[in-house]
A protein has these predicted regions:
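Flexible, glycine-rich terminal cap/loop adjacent to redox cofactors
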Residues: 2-4, 9-52, 346-347, 352, ...
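A structural signal for the hydrophobic beta-strands that form the central parallel beta-sheet
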Residues: 110, 139, 160, 229-231, ...
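Rossmann-like dinucleotide-binding cores of NAD(P)H-dependent redox enzymes
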Residues: 171-175, 181-241, 250, 312, ...
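Glycine-rich dinucleotide-binding loop and its adjacent helix/turn
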Residues: 141-196, 275-277, 281-291, 295
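Glycine-rich flavin
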Residues: 2-4, 20-148, 154-170, 206-207, ...
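FAD-site-proximal beta/loop scaffold in flavoenzymes
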Residues: 156-168, 258-328
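Short hydrophobic core segments
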Residues: 7-9, 115, 123, 131-142, ...
Length: 477
């Protein structure tokens, strides 16, 4: 007899989320945690909220607030120790929702320790001297920072987004190796706190996976705030000379106080003995089908193990699909079309669907691209954020294929376009939806109306027909 319906191998936020979802199916669920998950995303995002608060405080000076106080906006800053404490509290509150105690109350068997798959003779998981037998297994181990092989890096010492809480003071000079989303966010964050920040990437620009124009605009904002961006540059060596850290980046030698590595993430498979039970994988991701099954049909995977950006909401979606297949019938397929994500710089970058480059590759000249700036939007004028950018990519039949938004609230704005893509809606539907005036969301309507206008110009027969109809009405009135 089997012990469980599903055993979840966790050690990540995704693993705990998956256990909470699985408990709603009223089966027998076990969560194995080889290690306690690090809630670095909650901590990192809480720090960014502090930077957002600092920005808002500076904006209030222009409205006459803080009368009688120091009026030099440039002197406003964060107290690093207080910011760290607040971020830790915020991360703890976020993680408390799926604490081990709460999961146990939901009926989940929580098991601490490392395990490995065995065939005795059937598939099972051995952990702490126990053999756990289950109908299915879900791999949700999360990921760890990818550390590039750089001479002297380990001896020099470095930080990652997971060890940022160990930073005792704001570094005067900070070098960031790699340009993943968290690295870009933190480059701007520390620049706003007064650090001299240099970010070093091998690509031609930051955020190479994103739409080029949107990525260049984010890079321009960082550079305007004092961040030095070294593109197409490889870090050759790091070392400590007379107590000072040095980086050899291309033909430049940089003296820095701290080094932050933000070169992406890689799955941590632990020593699960996966190859013995027929699971194929490489150092970067598992081999999964559309149902999120591995090459062993009784073992599923989700989250960072699937590759792509390490966003929690995408991992949670994958866990939902995998658990539907496990607890119901294996007929549900993962569909990434219409799943949005955002990079929380200032302004933010929100993205969904295809980039301009991808759309041209898939559809050729059958696409239309509509771009607008936020220059003439009243809300953007009030916020002083007129450098925003909105791009909508459509098939010529009106079906929405993708969007990129750069604005202070892009992470909120992108949702309506994501829903439209998810439901297969056309841009005419967006054009028919009134937007609240004096909000950034008015941009949805502006772009949709611009698309309609451009196509009405192309359909000259329609314009001629309407003009003739109006002439006929005037004649007979």
């Amino acid at each position: 007899m089997l012990d469980y319906d599903v055993v979840i191998i966790g050690g990540s936020v995704t693993g705990r989320d998956a256990a909470a979802i699985a408990a709603t199916y009223h089966g027998r669920i076990a969560l194995l945690e080889p290690c306690a998950p690090l809630f670095w995303q909650g901590y990192h995002q809480a720090l960014l909220q502090g930077a957002e608060g600092l920005k808002q405080a500076k904006q209030r000076f222009s409205f006459g607030l803080y009368q009688g106080m120091e009026s030099d906006v440039s002197k406003l800053t964060l107290d690093w120790n207080i910011a760290q404490q607040s971020a830790s509290v915020g991360a703890s509150r976020t993680s408390a929702q799926n604490s081990l105690e709460n999961l146990a109350r939901l009926g989940v068997d929580v098991i601490s320790g490392a395990g490995e798959f065995v065939n005795q003779p059937d598939l099972a998981l051995a952990v702490n001297g126990r053999i756990l037998r289950s109908r299915y297994y879900l791999l949700a181990m999360g990921s760890k920072p990818k550390i590039p092989e750089i001479e002297g890096l380990a001896l020099t010492g470095f930080l990652t987004v997971e060890t940022l809480h160990k930073l005792s003071q704001i570094p005067q000079k900070l070098a960031i190796i790699g340009g993943d989303p968290s690295g870009v966010e933190l480059a701007q964050f520390f620049a706003q706190l007064g650090s001299q920040v240099t970010i070093i990437v091998k690509s031609s620009h930051l955020l190479g996976k994103e739409d080029h124009q949107a990525a260049y605009l984010i890079q321009a904002h960082l550079e305007a705030e004092g961040v030095t961006v070294l593109t197409q540059t490889e870090v050759i060596q790091t070392q400590v000379i007379q107590g000072q850290k040095w980086i050899q980046a291309g033909n430049k030698a940089l003296e820095v106080d701290e080094i932050l590595v933000a070169a992406g993430r890689q799955p941590q498979f632990y020593d699960l003995n996966l190859s013995t039970v027929g699971v194929k994988f490489n150092p970067n991701y598992l081999s999964l089908n559309q149902q999120l099954q591995t090459t062993n049909p009784r073992i599923y995977g989700c989250g960072d193990l699937a590759g792509g950006y390490p966003f929690e909401h995408i991992a949670a979606y994958e866990a939902q699909i995998a658990l539907k297949n496990i607890m119901l019938l294996p007929r549900f397929k993962v569909n990434y079309q219409g799943i949005p994500w955002a990079i929380l710089t200032q302004p933010q970058l929100g993205r969904v669907g295809l980039t301009e480059q991808q759309a041209k590759r898939y559809y050729g000249d059958k696409i239309s691209i509509h771009k607008q700036s936020f220059t003439h939007l009243s809300k953007a004028q009030l916020l002083g954020e007129i450098s925003g950018f909105y791009q909508l990519i459509c098939h010529r039949n009106g079906k929405i294929l993708g969007a990129a938004i750069v604005s202070p609230q892009a992470s909120e704005m992108i949702g309506i376009i994501a829903l439209a893509i998810r439901q297969g809606l056309k841009i005419d539907t967006i054009a028919q939806l009134p937007q609240i005036s004096s909000t950034l969301s008015e941009m949805h309507l502006k772009v949709a109306k611009a698309w309609q206008h451009s196509y009405s110009q192309k359909d000259s027969w329609k314009s001629d027909w309407i003009e003739t109809l109006n002439q006929w009405r005037r004649f007979w009135s």
